[in-house]
């Protein structure tokens, strides 16, 4: 699925099942919440935090939950792009070009990355 197709799919879903988009501010808050849930999984899977004994997501060390939370973040981001008229394909292409021009030589000699 392309980014454009994802935006279109989310838009159809919202119109068919979601009634309408939440307000932009509400979706910003929901995005923050979803990023926090992703951060919790990351801190337990890759960081120093331990899984709670009662948390079933820890059974596979959060592998399934990690993907689910990333998808939730993407969903809300697609909603926000749709409701604000942002073409994420176009913006991602511009962002990659900007980073390439700005950072093409930036990390080549970074000893922390070469280790």
Kindly give the residue locations of the regions a language model identified.
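Flexible "arm" and connector segments at domain edges
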Residues: 1-70, 74-115
